[in-house]
């Protein structure tokens, strides 16, 4: 065994980057790692910032996959769509794990910098709102917090003006089963998707004959899987907030834990959950 330190360059690894793109160059790490600006001298504020910044990065990827999945469905590329939906589920699994890190912050730790946050709040995350809009939970009232950023407001408004991903799924369902979409209920673009018996009847037909309708069955289960992880993320959000601030009002003026608990009752794909009791 040699006593000298291993030199990867001797095995052909490139060690100098004055003339080439490095890892840091490709990822723009100089800019990325310079975006954590604490407003206080509290030690745990850095954790709080990085927790939310990394969550936003994962949500950016989730949106990238969801938009591509919607396009793939419209083009009949179901295999590609399934891969994208599976990835979104894994993204929310990753986001769920991140709460474990934030839970190491105690209420006493949080109070040391909470005032520095002002009225900023996670419920103002436009990417989270866009994910909900894409999946079908559409509340036009939630546009208001983004009026001060015209391009963001326009992005969210544009999503509200088009069918959600679940609307496209149901269009595919009716087209496959009926051969047309004449009986497909018109989607409400400006309201959360509500349970519809006509849609549920079609899904029951799928679940009653999965061999014939395997692609639709697999699609439905991919959506249930996605919402399962999404619900867990919401639940972990509630328990983390309750653990850290109790039942105080949120920094954004919401009722805090009570507001988050209300969100737990929201179902993105209600027909796919309700039909389970009818099988």
From Swiss-Prot:
It is an enzyme of class 1 (oxidoreductase). Pathway: Amino-acid degradation; L-tryptophan degradation via kynurenine pathway; L-kynurenine from L-tryptophan: step 1/2. Binds 1 heme group per subunit. One of its GO terms (molecular function) is heme binding. Signal peptide: none annotated. Its EC number is 1.13.11.11. Heme binds at residue 237. Its cofactor is heme. Keywords: Dioxygenase, Heme, Iron, Metal-binding, Oxidoreductase, Tryptophan catabolism. GO terms for biological process: L-tryptophan catabolic process to acetyl-CoA; L-tryptophan catabolic process to kynurenine. The keyword Manganese does not apply. The keyword Heme applies. It catalyses: L-tryptophan + O2 = N-formyl-L-kynurenine. Substrate binds at residues 48-52, 110, 114, 251. InterPro entries: Trp/Indoleamine_2_3_dOase-like, Trp_2_3_dOase. HAMAP family: T23O (MF_01972). Homotetramer. Heme-dependent dioxygenase that catalyzes the oxidative cleavage of the L-tryptophan (L-Trp) pyrrole ring and converts L-tryptophan to N-formyl-L-kynurenine. Catalyzes the oxidative cleavage of the indole moiety. Belongs to the tryptophan 2,3-dioxygenase family. This is Tryptophan 2,3-dioxygenase. It comes from Ruegeria sp. (strain TM1040). The gene is kynA.
């Amino acid at each position: 065994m040699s006593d000298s330190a291993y030199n990867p360059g001797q095995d052909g690894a490139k060690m100098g980057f004055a003339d080439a793109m490095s890892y840091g160059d490709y990822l723009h790490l100089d800019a990325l790692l310079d975006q954590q600006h604490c407003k206080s001298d509290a030690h745990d504020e850095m954790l709080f910032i990085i927790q939310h910044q990394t969550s936003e990065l994962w949500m950016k990827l989730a949106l990238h996959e969801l938009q591509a999945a919607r396009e793939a469905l419209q083009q009949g590329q179901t295999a590609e769509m399934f891969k994208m939906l599976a990835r979104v589920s894994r993204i929310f699994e990753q986001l769920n794990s991140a709460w474990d890190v934030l839970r190491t912050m105690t209420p006493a730790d949080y109070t040391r910098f909470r005032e520095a946050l002002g009225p900023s709040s996670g419920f103002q995350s436009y990417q989270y709102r866009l994910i909900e809009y894409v999946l079908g939970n559409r509340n036009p009232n939630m546009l208001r917090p983004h009026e001060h950023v015209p391009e963001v407001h326009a992005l969210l408004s544009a999503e509200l003006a088009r069918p959600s991903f679940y609307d496209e799924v149901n269009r595919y369902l009716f087209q496959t089963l009926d051969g047309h979409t004449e009986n497909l209920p018109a989607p409400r673009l400006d309201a959360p998707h509500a349970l519809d018996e006509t849609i549920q009847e079609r899904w029951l037909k799928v679940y009653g004959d999965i061999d014939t309708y395997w692609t639709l069955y697999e699609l439905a289960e991919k959506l249930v899987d996605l919402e399962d992880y999404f619900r867990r993320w919401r639940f972990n959000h509630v328990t983390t907030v309750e653990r850290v601030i109790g039942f105080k009002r949120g920094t954004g003026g919401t009722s805090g834990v009570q507001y988050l608990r209300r969100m737990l009752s929201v179902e993105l794909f209600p027909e796919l959950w309700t039909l389970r009791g009818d099988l």
